Amino acid sequence: MNLQHHFLIAMPALQDPIFRRSVVYICEHNTNGAMGIIVNKPLENLKIEGILEKLKITPEPRDESIRLDKPVMLGGPLAEDRGFILHTPPSNFASSIRISDNTVMTTSRDVLETLGTDKQPSDVLVALGYASWEKGQLEQEILDNAWLTASADLNILFKTPIADRWREAAKLIGVDILTMPGVAGHA
């Protein structure tokens, strides 16, 4: 089972404060473990424009049709001071990993320098921090009913209102997560 370019959807019983009602986009999954970004937990009072200001990046030339007031996500509990930018192609930045045909993760400053300009990728999600699982850990959490999985949907990843992503991701597999009981069993 390879879950790269999939969503992990937290089950209602998962009460960890960081992962409760979370949707995690899996960027990498192999025999050594998994790495992902939470895509529905906005950091309070931090917008993309705030990150650019902090890094002294001024979009030149500024394309006013591109909004920079989008929230920055808490990507996970690890390396919360490190930026991860999920975006649609191109992937010609200094430090990019192509996750799928339509999704790229970049960690280098050069992608930030395109934000707010006509060079910006068409869809962008900025996160600080990431989540990771050791070998076999994620698979065990899935067996323990901590997570549902669904193929990632770019509309949910980039366009669905943040507050609706958990419910909408579950709908991808026909689940109304708001009516699920807190504890699931094994069939």
From Swiss-Prot:
Offer one Pfam family short name for this entry: DUF179
Q: Which domain of life is it from?
A: Bacteria
CC terms in the record's Gene Ontology section = cytosol
Q: PANTHER family of this UniProt entry?
A: UNCHARACTERIZED PROTEIN YQGE (PTHR30327), UPF0301 PROTEIN YQGE (PTHR30327:SF1)
Q: What HAMAP family does the database record attribute to this sequence?
A: UPF0301 (MF_00758)
Protein family per UniProt = Belongs to the UPF0301 (AlgH) family.
Q: What is the protein's name according to its record?
A: UPF0301 protein YqgE
Q: Which organism is it from?
A: Shigella boydii serotype 4 (strain Sb227)
Encoding gene per record: yqgE
